[in-house]
Structure formats: structure tokens, C-alpha cells
Swiss-Prot record:
This is Cadherin-related family member 1. Interacts with PROM1. It is a single-pass membrane protein. It comes from Bos taurus (Bovine). Glycans are attached at N58, N89, N288, N297. Residues 723-867 are cytoplasmic. Expressed in photoreceptor cells of the outer nuclear layer of the retina. Gene3D superfamilies: Cadherins. Residues 22-701 are extracellular. Keywords: Calcium, Cell adhesion, Cell membrane, Glycoprotein, Membrane, Receptor, Repeat, Sensory transduction, Signal, Transmembrane, Transmembrane helix, Vision.
Length: 867
């Protein structure tokens, strides 16, 4: 009994003891972020490439036996990983997709050959930006009435991105922008008609707008990528609607930002009739949920906020929009309802706002006179602009949009608030006659904000007229032609002047003036020029009149035009023969000429034709109808042939000639002409007879010849008399009348005087030179044209030392001889005696004595000699 177990049990007991000593292997738990261990809290990006070594299973056996690794999945799941049983390296064998499978469940096991330890692990698949935005509710087809107001919301596109974070946020823009038609809200995807855009069903029944949805970007395979998607919004322009309304693009979401102004559009709901053939129009209305904060445009479905965002009490508004069809008869039809969610978004941004005296205002009007002074301020405009933001967000620029260069705005840059001043830049462009209304837009646009919010206000200036224009004639000159026989008071022409000013300033009064205006009058209002009632016009006296017409407004501003009036000649004068036509003398073989004049001013009224109306006999003379020359017929070549024509053998013939003008009606005058016919032989025998015969036709010719002969005789007489007068005057100048030369008191003999003159000839000659031309003296006292030189009282004659008998008291000794005393006037000698006396003396000696005498007299006058 005290012995051990039986021997047969010993091997089994040994085996059991050995089995109990072999412990199971286990994994190492290295925690999150480790790439080896038991895959606890292991995550893997979904963009990991297939075949990548992503993890290493790591474990151990307490006995140090080698271990092997295994991984398995649910039968319904994919086998995503494979493992190296010896090394434990896990390799990705299938692509991951977080959006399809964001976690993977697997069973990993470790075995030492005897023991197998298995664990269930969950591998998290992390996001990568591998999903592009995807539009939902495609296709986008919008039915828009062609009368939809510009700026209205017409559709909303919506795209979702299954990525997370910024890679899942979506913004919208137009790929092919339509700057004149559509725009899209970058946050909400609301598609709107641009301001000023108009849809026209007849021009385009459909518009295709490409909208791009772009995510916020993220990592994909180690690189930053931004993915996008596009969709096409088909905007069908509707003409009519008639089926039950159906909302398009539900659900509806809208956003009201802090800077949204009351009356701004938030979003637009769209409903259309299912009957596209001839649809009825629909009307929108808000059923409940707005609390007076929102209104909907009953025709476009545009929902607008009516209160300032600061006055809104809730963050989210759930509105119910009802659409009602209206039949062609105007009665309500089918209805539909849709919920609309509007969220209030808090942003610190306000657009600039214009204020008038009574509050916010977007239209300002002013009346002012045209052409104000340059630099004048438009004080009638009270405009204030304000931006409620702070700092850089409240800085904006001001400018005027409209016809350039007329006005400028001050200031041009504003921070928060400013008083707007508009100043005149171009006074000439502010013209009532060019434009009665000037319209500008005052634009305020932010400077440093990405949104560039702006606002506009209309500035309308009504111009008032002033008298700034001068009446202007339609032409600088006017030309008129009237017949000279026009009666008094006849209309001549009408002048027209236009004054573009309005009212009384535009009324024009006419007047005429000038040297040629005496015979004319002008109507002060109509500008009609007519002749004076008493005027008698005569083209022969004055054929042309020229004067000025004046157009003047009520304040005296005027302009001038020149008027030229030409009188048209009328045949109102008879041809008139001269007096010499009554009798003519014809030399055989030479024609005689008659001449008549017509006082009319113009041709053909003053052109005269000549004819012989009566002659006895009628076959003797011919006449040139144009020149009036009369000659004997070619058959009559001698006086004998002429005498044989009549029994009496007359040499004097009587003709009745006629002068007739070419006017219409024509006037004529007749005259009786006597022609004396002589032969050339008779004239050659007696020149005086020839002359008298020639002057018989023209007595004034003889008078002219006699007057010419008398004129020649008179001219010769005057020429001889003038020559004689100047010769006597020159000779008498050297013999002054009643002048006595007083001798010097020096007792020097005359011989000394002569020697002094002889040896100092050069110096004495200088003294004889006359420094200043003396006036002509009246030596003969026979001319009243010259004034005699002043004379001193005549002193007694100086005593003469022993005058010799017969010596003349007026003798003056000279170098070459003595001067003869002046002889008293005696009766004029006969020409022969004068010639004999002139021949006595030498001409050379007489000339020399005369010259020395003249020089001596000038010398004595220069030395102030006593007389």
C-alpha cells in the first residue's frame, strides 16, 4: 500500500507533466501608432497602394519555440491582407475605400505548433481626398419664365463630397461664365440671373450653364490635390405654364448673412406645371414660419429677407412655401407646398449705404441752371455715405459713373462715413439744349475686402434753361432776285434765324440796316423782307442792293447775315437816237453810221437792231442791222449813176430809219435821216471843204479842233511868260531896292580892301558861303506871294570921299570890275535896241561880276551890315 503508482501509469503521467509545461505563444501589444505587434488600434489610409507592407505581426512563445502567424476574415468579407507566416509581414492585397468600408475586421493568430492563439482586431481606414464632389439630383433642368426679374434666383445646384474635413467641403462657380446672364452663389449653389439680364423666349428657349463644384483640397498619395465635378444646368425659358405645380430642386436651404440688407433675396424656390405643352403660371406664397421676417415674390419664388439680420430672433427659420397655379381665366387651380430652411449666418461685413435727409436713399434729384461756374458745389444734394463695419472693412472708394469729365466727387476715399460733395468740372457740357436731364450713378465700392461689396445711388439733375445762345441764321448770306417793276410792298425773300433757347429767350426779332436797306422792310417776327410801299425800283439806276439783317432775342443777343438783292432788268426804255442822226454826209464809197442807245441795264433789252423803214426810192441804200452802218448799194459806184436814179439828180436823200431793241415786248424809235453824198475828187481839190464836210455831221468835232489850237497857243504863251518871269526874278535879286550900304569907319583906302580880297581869297571865299539858306527877297516889289525881310530904318547915306563926276553912287569895287548902278524904270525898249545893248558887254565878264556881287552882298548880310 505505501508503494508508488503502478509502472504502467508512469509514461502517461510523464506526458501530462510535459504538456502542462508547454505555454501558449502570445502577441506583443505595442500600442497605437506602432507598426508591429498585435495590430491594436491600427489605422491605414485608404490610398495605400496594393502590395504595400503595412504591418508586422510580432509575438513570442514562452518556451522560445518558433511561431507562425495567420490572418483570416469573415467568409462574407474580402480578404484585404496577406501575412508572411514566418516573418509576420502583413501586405495589402486589395484596394481600400473608406467611403465603402471605413473599418476592416480580421482575426490574427499566432501558433507555436502546439498552441494556437487567435485575436479579433479592427483596422480603421482613414480618409484621403480620393472622392470628387458629386452633384445630386441631376440633371438640373430649370424652367424660368421669360419675364423673370433680373437678379432673381432661378435654381440651386447641390454637390456632396463623401470625404471628410476640408476635402468634403464644396464651393461653386461657373466654368463658362455668362457675364450678361447668370451667376452662382459660391456657398449655396444658388444660380441667379445677373442684374440687368433679360431672358427672351423668342431669342433663346434654353440656356446651358456649366456649374463646377470644387472641394476644399486634401492629401492623396502624399500630394495635395483638389477635386472637382461639373454639371450642366439647363435653363428652359418658359412661355406659359398650365399644369399642376411641382417643386424643382428640393429640399431648399438658404442663408442670411449679417451684412444682408433688408429686401435682399435669400434663395429662390422653383415650381413648374407638369404640363409642358401650354403651362399655366404659378404664384408663390408663404403659409407660415416667417414671423414677418421674410417675403416671397409671388411670381418668381424668390424669398427675400425684410428685416435687418440683427433684428432676427431665431437662428433657423422653417418656412412653408405654397405654390398655386393660375388658369388663363385668372382663377386659382392646383396647389403644392414645400418646406424651406433658412439659417442666419453671423458675419461682420456691411456694404456702404447712401443716406439722404430722411434716411437710406438710392436716388437723389436736383434742379439747377445750365452752365454753372466751374468749381461750383452742388449744394442742393445732401448725400451721406456710411459703412457700418470697422477698420479696413469700412474703407471704400467713391466715384461717379456716367458721362465723364462733367462732375467730380469729393472725397474719393472714405473711412466709415463722409458727406458726399459733387463739384462742377466742365461747365460747357452742362447744356440745357443738349440734354435737359443729366443722370449719373454714385458708386461706393469697398477697397480692402475680398467681397468688394458696393452700392449705388442715382443722381438725377434737371437742367433749367438760361439765355445762353445767340440767334443763328440758317445761312451767312441770302441772295434774292426780283424784277425791277415789282410794285411797292412786294415780298423779296424770307430769312430765318433759330435760337435754341426755350420760352421767350427763343423768340427772335428781325431788323435790317445798311446803306442799301432804305427801299426795303422786314417783318419783325416772320423775317419776310419786302419792298417799301412807296419804293420804285430801277435796275438802270441801281441794279444791286446789299444790306444786313439782324436777328435779336429779348436780351439783345444777336447775329447778322448779309442780304444781296439783284434787280432783274425789264425792257422799259425805248432806244434813243443821238442828235447827230438828223443829217449825215456820205463820201462815195464810204458808209455812214447811225447810233441809238437803250438805257436798259441788261441784254437783250439794251441791244438795238437797225432798219430802213422808208426810202424814196427804196433801192439806193443798205443798212447793217447790228452796227447801224448805211452804204450805197453795190450797183451805185459814181455820182452819175446816183443822179440817174431821180430825174432831178438830187444829192441829198431822206431816209426813215428805225432802232428796235431785242426785249420782250420790244420797243422801237424812228428818225428821219438826211444824207448828203459827195465825191472823193471834190474833197481832194479843197481840203477845207473836206474838213467842213467831215465836221458837218459832227459840229462838235470842229469845236474840238479849234479848242485844241487855242489851248496850244495859250500853253506856249504861258511857257514863255514863266521863263521870262524867272529870268527877271533871278536878275533882280542881286539888286535890292532902297538899300544903302554904310561904309566902315576904317580910313583904309579901297586899294587895301582890294588887296585883302586878292591875297586872302580862300578865307574870304569861306566867309562868302551861306550857312543857312536865306528866304527869297522881293527885290522888284511886284509880287504879293512873298513877305519882305524885316528892315531897319534907313540911315542917312554915308559921306562919299571925293566922288568923281559921273560916278554912280551904287558902284561897288570888285576884283574883276565894278557893278553898274540900277537904272530907273523906263519904257520898254524895242527888241532890236535890247539886243544891241546886250551885245555891248562881254557875257563872261557880266556873269563874273554878277556872281561876285551876289557873294559880296551875302557876306555883308552875314556880318549884320547896317542898311
Amino acid at each position: 500500500m505505501g508503494r508508488g503508482p503502478p509502472a504502467v501509469l508512469a509514461p502517461w503521467m510523464l506526458f501530462l507533466s510535459l504538456a502542462q509545461a508547454n505555454f501558449a505563444p502570445h502577441f506583443f501589444d505595442n500600442g497605437a501608432g506602432s507598426t508591429n505587434g498585435n495590430m491594436a488600434l491600427f489605422s491605414l489610409p485608404e490610398d495605400t497602394p496594393v502590395g504595400s507592407h503595412v504591418y508586422t505581426l510580432n509575438g513570442t512563445d514562452p518556451e522560445g519555440d518558433p511561431v507562425s502567424y495567420h490572418i483570416s476574415f469573415n467568409p462574407s468579407a474580402r480578404s484585404v491582407f496577406s501575412v508572411d507566416p514566418n516573418l509576420g509581414n502583413i501586405t495589402l492585397i486589395e484596394e481600400l475605400d473608406r467611403e465603402r468600408e471605413d473599418e476592416i475586421e480580421a482575426i490574427i493568430s499566432i501558433s507555436d505548433g502546439l498552441n494556437l492563439v487567435a485575436e479579433k482586431v479592427t483596422i480603421l481606414v482613414t480618409d484621403a481626398n480620393d472622392e470628387a464632389p458629386r452633384f445630386i439630383q441631376e440633371p438640373y433642368v430649370v424652367q424660368v419664365p421669360e419675364d423673370t426679374p433680373s437678379g432673381s434666383s432661378i435654381a440651386r445646384v447641390r454637390a456632396v463630397d463623401r470625404d471628410t474635413g476640408s476635402a468634403g467641403s464644396v464651393t461653386y462657380f461657373l466654368k463658362n461664365p455668362h457675364p450678361t446672364e447668370f451667376s452662382v452663389d459660391r456657398h449655396s449653389g444658388v444660380l441667379r440671373l445677373r442684374a440687368g439680364a433679360i431672358l427672351d423666349f423668342e431669342k433663346a428657349r434654353a440656356h446651358f450653364v456649366t456649374v463646377v463644384a470644387k472641394d476644399g483640397g486634401g492629401k492623396l498619395r502624399g500630394a495635395d490635390v483638389v477635386l472637382s465635378a461639373t454639371t450642366v444646368v439647363t435653363v428652359n425659358v418658359e412661355d406659359v405654364q398650365d399644369m399642376g405645380p411641382v417643386f424643382v430642386g428640393t429640399p431648399y436651404y438658404g442663408y442670411v448673412y449679417e451684412d444682408t440688407l433688408p429686401g435682399s433675396e435669400v434663395l429662390m424656390v422653383v415650381a413648374m406645371d407638369g404640363d409642358r405643352g401650354k403651362p399655366n403660371r404659378v404664384l408663390y406664397s408663404l403659409v407660415n414660419g416667417s414671423d414677418g421676417a421674410f417675403e416671397i415674390n409671388e411670381t418668381s419664388g424668390a424669398i427675400s429677407v425684410m428685416q435687418s439680420p440683427s433684428q432676427l430672433r431665431r437662428e433657423v427659420y422653417e418656412l412653408h412655401v405654397q405654390v398655386t397655379e393660375v388658369s388663363s381665366a385668372g382663377t386659382p387651380a392646383a396647389q403644392a407646398m414645400v418646406p424651406v430652411t433658412i439659417r442666419i449666418v453671423d458675419l461682420n461685413n456691411h456694404p456702404p449705404t447712401f443716406y439722404g435727409e430722411s434716411g437710406p436713399q438710392n436716388r437723389f434729384e436736383l434742379s439747377m441752371y445750365e452752365h454753372p461756374p466751374q468749381g461750383e458745389i452742388l449744394r442742393g444734394l445732401k448725400i451721406t455715405v456710411n459703412d457700418s463695419d470697422q477698420g479696413a472693412n469700412a474703407k471704400f472708394n467713391l466715384r461717379l459713373v456716367g458721362p465723364g469729365g462733367i462732375f467730380r466727387v469729393v472725397p474719393q476715399t472714405v473711412l466709415n462715413e463722409a458727406q458726399v460733395t459733387i463739384i462742377v468740372e466742365n461747365s460747357a457740357a452742362i447744356d440745357f439744349e443738349k440734354s435737359k436731364v443729366l443722370t449719373f450713378k454714385l458708386l461706393a465700392i469697398e477697397v480692402n475686402t475680398p467681397e468688394k461689396f458696393s452700392s449705388t445711388a442715382d443722381v438725377v439733375i434737371q437742367l433749367l434753361d438760361t439765355n445762353d445762345n445767340v440767334p443763328k441764321f440758317t445761312s451767312h448770306y441770302y441772295v434774292a432776285r426780283i424784277p425791277e417793276n415789282a410794285p411797292g410792298g412786294s415780298n423779296v425773300l424770307a430769312v430765318t434765324a433759330v435760337d435754341p433757347d426755350s420760352g421767350p429767350w427763343g423768340e427772335v426779332k428781325y431788323s435790317i440796316y445798311g446803306s442799301g436797306a432804305d427801299l426795303f422792310l422786314i417783318h419783325p417776327s416772320s423775317g419776310i423782307i419786302y419792298t417799301q410801299p412807296w419804293a420804285s425800283l430801277d435796275a438802270e439806276a441801281t441794279a444791286r442792293y446789299n444790306f444786313y439783317v439782324k436777328a435779336e432775342d429779348m436780351e439783345g443777343r444777336y447775329s447778322l447775315a448779309e442780304v444781296f438783292i439783284t434787280l432783274l432788268d425789264v425792257n422799259d426804255h425805248y432806244p434813243q437816237f443821238g442828235k447827230s442822226v438828223q443829217e449825215k454826209t456820205m463820201v462815195l464809197g464810204t458808209p455812214v453810221k447811225i447810233e441809238a442807245t437803250d438805257q436798259d441795264a441788261e441784254e437783250p433789252n439794251n441791244l438795238v437792231d437797225y432798219s430802213i423803214t422808208h426810202a424814196e426810192p427804196a433801192n439806193v441804200f443798205d443798212i447793217n442791222a447790228h452796227t447801224g452802218e448805211i452804204w450805197l448799194k453795190n450797183s451805185i459806184r459814181s455820182l452819175d449813176a446816183l443822179h440817174n436814179i431821180t430825174p432831178s439828180g438830187d444829192r441829198t436823200w431822206s431816209l426813215e430809219v428805225q432802232a428796235k431793241d431785242r426785249g420782250s415786248p420790244s420797243f422801237s424809235t424812228t428818225a428821219l435821216l438826211k444824207i448828203d453824198i459827195v465825191d472823193t475828187e471834190m474833197l481832194s481839190r479843197s481840203p477845207m471843204a473836206a474838213f467842213l464836210m467831215q465836221t458837218k455831221d459832227n459840229p462838235m468835232k470842229a469845236v474840238g479842233v479849234l479848242a485844241g489850237i487855242m489851248a496850244i497857243i495859250v500853253a506856249i504863251t504861258v511857257l514863255i511868260s514863266t521863263a521870262t518871269f524867272w529870268r527877271n526874278k533871278k536878275s533882280n535879286k542881286v539888286q535890292p531896292v532902297r538899300r544903302v550900304l554904310r561904309k566902315r569907319p576904317s580910313p583904309a583906302p579901297r586899294s587895301v580892301r582890294i588887296e585883302w580880297l586878292k591875297f586872302r581869297r580862300t578865307k574870304a571865299a569861306d566867309k562868302f558861303v551861306l550857312r543857312e539858306a536865306p528866304p527869297n527877297e522881293n527885290c522888284n516889289n511886284n509880287s504879293r506871294g512873298s513877305t519882305p525881310a524885316p528892315q531897319a530904318p534907313a540911315p542917312p547915306p554915308p559921306p562919299s570921299p571925293a566922288p568923281s563926276v559921273g560916278q554912280a553912287p551904287w558902284t561897288v569895287p570888285t576884283v574883276s570890275g565894278s557893278l553898274a548902278p540900277q537904272q530907273p524904270q523906263q519904257p520898254s525898249p524895242k527888241p532890236r535896241a535890247v539886243a544891241k545893248r546886250k551885245a555891248v558887254g562881254s557875257p563872261v565878264q557880266s556873269a563874273l561880276v554878277s556872281e561876285l556881287r551876289q557873294k559880296f552882298e551875302k557876306k555883308n548880310l552875314h556880318s549884320k551890315a547896317y542898311f
